[in-house]
Regions:
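A membrane-interface helix-boundary motif in multi-pass transporters
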Residues: 1-6, 189-207
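A late C-terminal transmembrane helix in Major Facilitator Superfamily
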Residues: 159, 164-193
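C-terminal membrane-cytosol helix-exit motif in multi-pass small-molecule transporters
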Residues: 6-26, 213
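Intracellular juxtamembrane helix-capping segments at the cytosolic ends
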Residues: 147-161
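Helix-to-loop junctions at the C-terminal end of transmembrane segments
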Residues: 93-107, 191
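Pair of pore-lining "gating" transmembrane helices in MFS-fold secondary transporters
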Residues: 41-61, 139
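Juxtamembrane intracellular "pre-TM" segments in multi-pass secondary transporters
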Residues: 21-48
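Structural signature of the two symmetry-related core transmembrane helices
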Residues: 109-124, 204
Length: 213
């Protein structure tokens, strides 16, 4: 229930209050470094920001449309809840080992795997409209988002010096959440006007962009 969220929020507040961050260096406190435009033109920044933005944008585009699409396909509320529960598991459960995968196989390989998982999600989604089609598609979508988001933000740390950290991360967050907001705005409109299959097809160029970045 909504009341339980109060308890979760209080626990989160207590944990956050107990955190102790290392003090910032002088360069971090006063900023400086290269102009933001120069940082953003680096290939490493482009790949990192693009991966995170595509991960968030495509995930949000398809996830937000899923309840409507499943309703249009005659699937019930319980089916929708089941699919979205597993989607959320796919989003966050891999976080326990994504860092280890990055350390072992390299961040670029993890990003590539995330893009391939999103591509697999689309392939499954356009093949049919049964419960299992939605379940597999949304599960893979969640795992793909995890790899692209964590991989992208990990790679981003190679794009800046300590004095440039705040503005570089700020730009990355802006691009990422701009993609998220845009996909949220168009998701419902597209699935109701064009359909679930077309919505997935629209996501293909963005996923391809992250694959070949």
């Amino acid at each position: 229930s909504y009341a339980s969220l109060i308890g979760f929020a209080l626990v989160a507040m207590a944990i956050a209050a107990s955190l102790r961050f290392p003090p910032q260096s002088q360069s971090e406190q006063h900023g400086g470094g290269r102009p933001l435009g120069e940082i953003a033109r680096q290939p490493v920044f482009i790949v990192a920001a693009l991966s995170a933005a595509v991960g968030y944008g495509v995930m949000n585009l398809l996830m937000n449309a899923t309840p409507l699409a499943m309703d249009f396909c005659g699937l019930g509320f319980g089916d929708t809840a089941f699919v979205l529960q597993w989607h959320v598991i796919g989003m966050f459960a891999p976080s326990f080992f994504t860092g280890h995968l990055i350390a072992r196989f390299g961040v670029l390989n993890v990003l590539f795997a995330g893009a391939l998982l999103m591509a697999a999600c689309i392939v499954i989604a356009v093949q049919g409209i049964t419960l299992m089609h939605f379940w597999w598609a949304l599960l893979l979508l969640g795992i793909g988002w995890n790899f692209l988001y964590i991989g992208g933000t990990t790679l981003l740390t190679e794009a800046y010096a300590p004095a440039e950290k705040a503005k570089t991360q700020g730009l990355n967050d802006f691009l990422m959440f701009f993609a998220m907001a845009g996909s949220s705005f168009f998701s419902g409109v597209l699935v109701t006007s064009a359909g679930w299959t077309v919505l997935n097809q629209i996501a293909i160029p963005f996923v391809a962009l992250s694959v070949f970045a």
